Amino acid sequence: NLVTLIKDNINLIKELDTTIIINFNSNKLEIILNSDGEQLSRVFFNLIKNSIESIQDKKLDNINFKGIIDITLNDSTSDMNFVIVDNGLGFGAFTGNLKDILNPYFTTKKKGTGLGLAIVNKIINDHNGTIDFIPIEDGAKINIIFIK
């Protein structure tokens, strides 16, 4: 059940920064995808963690900044859609390199390995899915679609 999987990841990772508000909405109480739950858990954990880190970096310039992460999971007859939107730094650091964001060893983090999103992309592809990084005005949006 992906709803439970995402909620479990939110509960685990929100301890990294309890000041960030994480909202989760789903159009169903139970969404089943024929998948490797452990691998998908890694995807959701990594993406939520990246959002938290982006918000924390933005807070360095504004101590009163209120971080928000909105996560949506919707199921339809043909696909399952996972969307995460945050009001962190966004993809500004990747301007001109957005296509490289999924390449192994590509990173803008001081202590990053550049493997996180490459692994996320492989797991999503292995599950018949696609991932898109969408720059928005005040943050970042990531859209994942799994075809059933």
Model regions: which residues?
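Conserved glycine-rich
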Residues: 129-130
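Conserved catalytic submotifs in the C-terminal HATPase_c
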Residues: 19-31
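Short conserved segment of the HATPase_c
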Residues: 91-104
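Conserved micro-motifs of the catalytic ATP-binding
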Residues: 32-35, 108
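Short alpha-helical Gxxx[C/S/T] motif in the catalytic ATP-binding
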Residues: 116, 120
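ATP-lid-like helix-loop hinge signature
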Residues: 52-77
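A conserved beta-strand-to-alpha-helix junction within the catalytic ATP-binding
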Residues: 1-10
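Detector for a conserved hydrophobic position within an alpha-helical segment of the HATPase_c
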Residues: 124-125
